[in-house]
């Protein structure tokens, strides 16, 4: 395939222009995306934002490029961490540190603050499959944690919308992660990093081996990463939800431990309506008068119970094989397997409600520890049950077999099949059964009744607490199957240069399912819930792109180095 553009590239000069941009500590440079053949001649390559190969250093749209050297200098441990330093990736992007996440353990990109579903993620120019769980229940996105840092050669970020080139997913822009194409030898990497507080140790190991022969080349990478967790109270800025001392707001919860009682208007005992605090240090048997004597709400600082940065373990393997079939065709296979495990914690379950909704925040008059002798409502935190624990495991498999081929002297084609599958299990512990909790609240037997009038541990017996605890399970899966064929080449010589054309077609099928456990789906978990969903869709697309040079090297005029027009057309049909 070297011969395809050889005659023309001899006429072209590469203008070696570079620009260094610095933002938040990461050097960003417009580096050449230019390949050379064995004779040192420039070989056109496809850059992000166009399907037409070129030897130019820049395409028609603004692109930020981060090469391997800059990645190493950045100190970023994941692709998500690397892209988080871009100023263009801002509002609307979440990473694995996001609490209350509907897609825990993931990392996305939101270019220009438009949301993660509007930024298209590519790996070597082809789509990365969507994560198996939607963020905020509706936002489909691709997780950068599916991509091992060890195989990344460079990252190209297209900062403009590119729907005519890549489809409707590319409204905000495109992130194209380019992996190694050819590697020979053996490379072993090991690193360890930690915070100045010495509490977030991170280990990374990778080994890459590659070989090149007469008929092709191949490489394989095996990598492992482990990072310790950090709790919110390990840092001063996040130690408390009460930020009034720093000029902020008090975000502490109104469901505390000790909790609060709400007396409704028309109390049978003649108490004035309002909130009243269970006394601090209560052993579980305060009188009604002691509670009424402390109006107000006991607040709960949930930050010390929460994970700031979750515990991570990732491992996987990636490989690429390029094999020359004939002088005109080369076959390739790119395979990736990833396993990701995440552990994070949330504050214990809160309980609150009112008499009109039949929820779990109602204390019946029958409760063995109710000193009021009438139904009332309360706000309480079940700290004795313990923090809610989440263990998430992702498994990712991706394979792309394909072939590149020459068509005549100045056209190249490519056809490939992509299969991307992701399985996720989210296992939760220390959740509270709504039915069991309401039963314990209604019990008149001190041995089985739940006591909301204590503070701290040791108020309720282990048997009462064990009867409340339930586990949750959420299983999700996404699959992407796509076939594409494309070609690009020269059409006609114009005074300003060569008129070039790219055409292509693709067909894809996507399937997704996100199924929760029966208790969660029936809203039988206190202060928690969920929905199950599944679906599929197919997409067919065709596109064409034309590069029309108007002014070039042969007809250059004063003040204009080059001038051209790029026209792109794309049609998509979803069903």
Model-predicted segments: where are they?
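N-terminal periplasmic accessory domains that precede
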Residues: 79-82, 86, 109-110, 142-145, ...
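Non-catalytic regulatory/gating segments with a bias toward low-complexity or hydrophobic composition
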Residues: 63, 71, 83, 155-156, ...
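N-terminal Sec signal peptide and the immediately downstream disordered periplasmic leader
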Residues: 1-85, 147, 206, 210, ...
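Surface-exposed, low-complexity loop segments enriched in small/polar and acidic residues
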Residues: 136, 228-230, 234, 240-245, ...
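Short acidic/polar hinge/loop motifs at secondary-structure boundaries
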Residues: 126-159
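Extracytoplasmic beta-strand/coil segments of soluble accessory domains associated
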Residues: 55, 84-127
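Hydrophobic, lipid-facing positions within transmembrane beta-strands of outer-membrane proteins
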Residues: 107, 173, 184, 203-207, ...
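Short strand-turn segments of transmembrane beta-barrel domains in outer membranes
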Residues: 156, 183-211, 300-309
